[in-house]
């Protein structure tokens, strides 16, 4: 528990007033305020998204329309799941004056739209309410720490509280009058660059009673997770030393720092410390738009994070996902003892196409995160709740797939599906040698795509395929022989995903830590119109792709097992399902424009 000093009393009193609905809102501070009716803060659906849009997802989280990016502050409160997200309600293109969208769910699959939680209104956030996190304080009190872009376009950190703690949906939030709580300087003389200082993490508390939080910044090209401490969650002190820093990769966005149990498939509360846990530091690299993580040790005496020996601290290191996946945020679900991960999946289309369809951005399916039994990497898997959308189960018997073969998986909706498949290869002396210079799996996948014959591989699945194979997104394995062991390459090849010449058609790849002789090679793929999420080796490696077929859409899409290698491979298991449509962000108001509300606490209330 934090000490009961004066500042903590301020926060405690404010929380008490909020819980009894006694806070006075400063209505005169609102901007773009059309009506005092709270429901007017809902997103205007007067111009609805086209229901026939072939790229609109059916069971992935999306905003009702327009622009969405980072997931913010996911949590569970009074049995209700909350997801906040970076949202621009007027345009499917990013703008700095962004707000916090908000949705709630009882199952993490079906979502109800809630009023905007935070919007620009005060000098400290007038140019945008950027990303942040939620921390659950003692007595189950959630608070938001977020980055505001102030009236000088500097980045500062602010606090917001729920207006009514008895409301499980937390529809209204109040900004603290002491904001901003953390700030840099234009001269960078406090080791914080005021123009690159953002995305506060979930806070954690140690036995000394102090709260700790990290914020991403940079010094030149050195990325830093600046560490702040507080006795009361209001007055924050820069410790002067970062939790961690690395030279050469620019600003660290959306830092996430959390413990993982060793030898347990359970999540851990963010403040857990002990001999049976390691720590994960995840960073999103603005310069490359990739993110990486390391696993290591948290030295609580020095308040520093030390990655395990051999860790690669760059975008060539370990990633949650080797495709389109950025600005991720995890939280601990204390009701199910899971750590759950959200991540933003950006478009691969040109801006003109985004404007035409009226929306941009998808959230990946939420995933559980645990430490692999090796202790060297994380394992991710779609939440078990996703399985409740499955229908029309199709099973294929164990069979050999000869080189050059193509087998259709029929009787499911191939544009909206979930498929699990496992392969087995025989031990052989006829395996391609891996060139010792081929150390980058993404480059290797681009050179050896699905159409390039090998020996063992490529074999896998052709998703979102047209009948004549003019279009398909291939997810496959290719086996090589390295100096001392077999090497398994997993690829997501989008080079033939669309006949539209303007879409980005990349190949993503990763070397999978699996023994192909003694273990099955498994894939699980979630297909949802314009997104293909692939999980291999039971979640050791993940690749997410955004694709926009012109022919393989809706009921015209096909799903195939293929083997374009010269050697036979065996399917040991194949199960596929159509996926039902989830209820996501159906509007509860269709009558009025969304308004921005300042949600500011009058100072004289304290």
Swiss-Prot record:
Q: Which residues are glycosylated?
A: 5, 110, 164, 193, 237, 346, 564, 585, 590, 593
Q: Which residues does UniProt mark as catalytic?
A: 70
Coiled-coil annotated residue ranges, if any: none
Question: Which Enzyme Commission number(s) are listed?
Answer: 3.2.1.154
Task: From the UniProt annotation, give the residues forming the signal peptide.
Answer: 1-21
What's a GO biological-process term for it?
carbohydrate metabolic process
For this protein, the activity regulation entry reads: Not inhibited by sucrose.
Keywords per UniProt: Disulfide bond, Glycoprotein, Glycosidase, Hydrolase, Signal
Family the entry assigns: Belongs to the glycosyl hydrolase 32 family.
Q: What does this protein do?
A: Hydrolyzes levan-type beta-(2->6)-linked fructans to fructose, but not inulin-type beta-(2->1)-linked fructans.
Protein's recorded name: Fructan 6-exohydrolase
Tell me what gene encodes this: 6-FEH
């Amino acid at each position: 528990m934090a000490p009961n000093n004066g500042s903590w009393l301020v926060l405690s009193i404010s929380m008490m007033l909020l819980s009894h609905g006694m806070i006075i809102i400063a209505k005169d501070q609102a901007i773009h305020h059309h009506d005092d009716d709270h429901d007017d803060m809902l997103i205007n659906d007067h111009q609805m998204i086209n229901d026939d849009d072939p790229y609109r997802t059916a069971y992935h989280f999306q905003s009702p329309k327009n622009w969405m990016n980072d997931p913010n502050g996911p949590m569970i409160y009074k049995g209700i799941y909350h997801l906040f997200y970076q949202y621009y309600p007027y345009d499917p293109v990013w703008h700095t004056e962004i707000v916090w969208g908000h949705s709630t769910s009882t199952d993490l699959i079906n979502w109800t739209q809630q009023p905007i939680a935070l919007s620009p209104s005060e000098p400290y956030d007038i140019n945008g309410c950027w990303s942040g996190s939620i921390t659950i304080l003692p007595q189950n009190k959630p608070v938001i720490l977020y980055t505001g872009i102030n009236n000088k376009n500097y980045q500062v950190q602010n606090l917001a509280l729920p207006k009514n703690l008895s409301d499980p949906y937390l529809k209204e939030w109040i900004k603290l009058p002491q904001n901003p709580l953390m700030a840099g300087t234009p001269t960078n003389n406090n080791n914080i660059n005021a123009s690159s200082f953002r995305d506060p993490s979930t806070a954690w508390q140690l036995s000394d009673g102090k709260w700790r939080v990290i914020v991403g910044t940079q010094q030149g090209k050195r990325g830093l997770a600046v560490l702040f401490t507080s006795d009361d969650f209001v007055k924050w002190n820069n410790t002067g030393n970062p939790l961690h820093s690395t030279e050469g990769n620019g600003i660290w966005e959306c830092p996430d720092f959390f413990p993982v149990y060793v030898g347990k498939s359970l999540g851990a509360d963010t403040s857990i410390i002990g001999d049976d846990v390691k720590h994960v530091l995840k960073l999103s690299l603005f310069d490359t738009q990739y993110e990486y993580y390391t696993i290591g040790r948290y030295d609580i005496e020095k308040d520093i994070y030390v990655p395990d020996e051999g860790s690669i601290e760059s975008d060539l290191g370990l990633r949650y996902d080797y495709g389109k996946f950025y600005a991720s945020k995890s939280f601990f679900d204390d009701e199910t003892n899971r750590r759950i991960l959200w991540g933003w999946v950006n478009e691969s289309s040109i801006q003109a196409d985004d404007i035409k369809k009226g929306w941009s951005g998808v959230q990946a399916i939420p995933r559980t995160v645990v430490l692999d039994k090796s202790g060297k990497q994380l394992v991710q898997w779609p939440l078990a709740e996703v399985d409740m959308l499955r229908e029309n189960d199709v099973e294929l018997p164990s069979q050999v797939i000869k080189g050059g073969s193509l087998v259709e998986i029929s009787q499911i909706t191939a544009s909206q599906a979930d498929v699990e498949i496992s392969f087995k290869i025989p031990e052989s002396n006829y395996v391609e040698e891996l060139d010792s210079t081929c150390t980058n799996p993404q480059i290797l996948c681009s050179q050896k795509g699905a159409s390039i014959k090998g020996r063992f591989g490529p074999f896998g699945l052709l998703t979102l395929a047209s009948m004549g194979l003019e279009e398909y997104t291939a997810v496959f394995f290719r086996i090589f022989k390295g100096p001392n062991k077999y090497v398994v390459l997993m690829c997501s090849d989008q080079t033939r995903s669309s006949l539209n010449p303007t879409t980005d058609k990349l190949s993503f790849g990763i070397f999978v830590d699996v023994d192909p002789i003694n273990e099955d090679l498994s894939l699980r793929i979630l297909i949802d119109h314009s997104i293909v999420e692939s999980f291999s080796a039971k979640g050791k490696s993940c690749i997410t792709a955004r694709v926009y077929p012109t022919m393989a859409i809706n009921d015209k899409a096909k799903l195939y097992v293929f083997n374009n290698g010269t050697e036979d491979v065996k399917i040991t298991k194949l199960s596929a399902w159509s996926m039902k449509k989830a209820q996501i962000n159906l509007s509860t108001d269709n009558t009025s424009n969304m308004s921005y509300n300042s949600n500011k606490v009058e100072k004289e209330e304290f």
